Amino acid sequence: MSNQVNSMNKGLTVKDLVTTGIFTALLFVFVLVGGVFFATNPVLTFFMPAGGGLLAGPIYLLLIAKVHKRWSLSIMGVIMGIIWFVTGMHWAFALGYLIMAIVADFVAGAGQYKSKKLNSLSYILFSIGGTGSYIVFFADPNGWAQTMLGNGTEQSYIDTMQATANTGILIAMFAAAIITSAISAFVGCKMLKKQFEKAGITA
């Protein structure tokens, strides 16, 4: 146990940072591919976090297996947040991923990055980060709309979102994000069994 803790607390090496960067790029692509269908539809856009969480689980878990040290997941969240922001997403979308990546880092770290259950929970929490923009939308729809209009979103898209939004959609958004990311984490654990055994990751 002491060896695992010492390994976790060691600083990130150049190799770790490069690996984190590569997997962050892959993760971004998988989240984008999973969520883009929903994002382009103002009625279905609330389920973008669910779509984004459906495919990326194996990539996320493999990153943990490759770099099981503190701050790798946080750095991933910073990079993804920056990418989302500069590509025109609402600032809360970027901030949501950043905050939840840090939370996810500490959750996975609680098991020294060796627990399948905590690593999977970590991924679920990370995926919930995609709800950040929508939380702000429900909390301050007018402010959200002004920001997105400034980012180039069409008024008709926003009008349809506002007409669709209700408490049921908000609950369904969170439930769907949790369910799809849990499925993705489960599939990832099955796909990466050999890699997990090599990295010492257990139940």
Task: List each model region and its residues.
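Short, charged juxtamembrane terminal tails flanking transmembrane helices
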Residues: 1-7, 193-203
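Interfacial aromatic-anchored transmembrane helix boundaries in multi-pass membrane proteins
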Residues: 35-40, 44, 80-108
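Short helix-perturbing small/polar motifs within transmembrane alpha-helices
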Residues: 29, 97-135, 185
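Aromatic-anchored segments of alpha-helical transmembrane domains
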Residues: 24-32, 79-87, 125-135
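Hydrophobic alpha-helical transmembrane segments
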Residues: 17-22, 50-51, 70-78, 94-95, ...
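Membrane-interfacial segments
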Residues: 34-42, 67, 71, 107, ...
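Hydrophobic transmembrane alpha-helices
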Residues: 2-71, 75
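Membrane-embedded alpha-helical hairpins and interfacial helices in multi-pass inner-membrane proteins
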Residues: 45, 120-193
